[in-house]
Structures are given as structure tokens and as C-alpha cells.
Amino acid sequence: MLSPKRTKYRKAHKGRIHGNAKGGTTLNFGTFGLKALEPERITARQIEAARRAITRAMKRAGRVWIRIFPDLPVSTKPAEVRMGSGKGSPEYWVARVHPGRVMFEIDGVAPELAREALALGAAKLPIKTKFIVRSVDA
């Protein structure tokens, strides 16, 4: 699963996801992509599940690029522990995804198969997404 090798700080504030994505809104690598339409925190497990679903649907043909990375630690306290006595320990990693962000890109497969594969991947994610195709520039 994806996680940073090292971080500047062990724990992070919760924060909020305001506005649309500033960068990463266009296809840079592949021909087809999956774009986020809602703001949400996507966990490393969800990214991995989507990646597996996409690769399996493509039958290992073509290439997949993951354009988001879980760099935010989420800490939780154990069950049935009283309030106070500090913040819990980091449990898992999430990526903050803004609307308009391209999350996955694929190439080397037919358009129908690409749409099907990305739809299977989108089913593993907790947000509404959109299938996008690289526009042909004249």
C-alpha cells in the first residue's frame, strides 16, 4: 500500500478540502482517465483496491498511472478509551482529493475496455467520478 517513506511531522491536523483542484486536472500520461467530481479523503486501501480492479479488468495489458498519493496521516484512538490524554497514534494514510483532480490514467487498451476498467475502479472509491478521454489537438 502507498505511504510516505518519511515525513516532517508524525501527526497532522484534520483540515478541510476547499475549492477545486489547482493542478492535476488534465491527462498527462495516458489516453483515458478517471476524474474526481467531489471533495473527499481517499485512503491508501481504497487507492490500492481501485488500482487492482482496473489492472484486473485490463487483463494486465496496457499501463496504469496513479496520480494521487496518500501523504496525510490519520490518527485514531483505541476503542473504549476515555477522552483526553493526547491524540491517538497514526493508523492509516489518506490523500486529499479536490473536485477536478485526475486520479487514474490508463493507456494501451481499447476505449470500451478502458471505460469498463475505470468504472470498476470507480466503484471502489467513495466519490462520484467522470471518465475522460484525451482530446486530439489539431
From Swiss-Prot:
GO terms for molecular function: rRNA binding; structural constituent of ribosome; tRNA binding. It holds the Pfam family Ribosomal_L16. Signal peptide: none annotated. The keyword Ribonucleoprotein applies. InterPro entries: Ribosomal_uL16, Ribosomal_uL16_bact-type, Ribosomal_uL16_CS, Ribosomal_uL16_dom, Ribosomal_uL16_sf. GO terms for biological process: translation. Residues 1-19 have a biased composition (Basic residues). Part of the 50S ribosomal subunit. GO terms for cellular component: cytosolic large ribosomal subunit. Binds 23S rRNA and is also seen to make contacts with the A and possibly P site tRNAs. This is Large ribosomal subunit protein uL16. Belongs to the universal ribosomal protein uL16 family. Gene3D superfamilies: Ribosomal protein L10e/L16. Residues 1-21 are annotated as: Disordered. Coiled coil: none annotated. Keywords: Ribonucleoprotein, Ribosomal protein, RNA-binding, rRNA-binding, tRNA-binding.
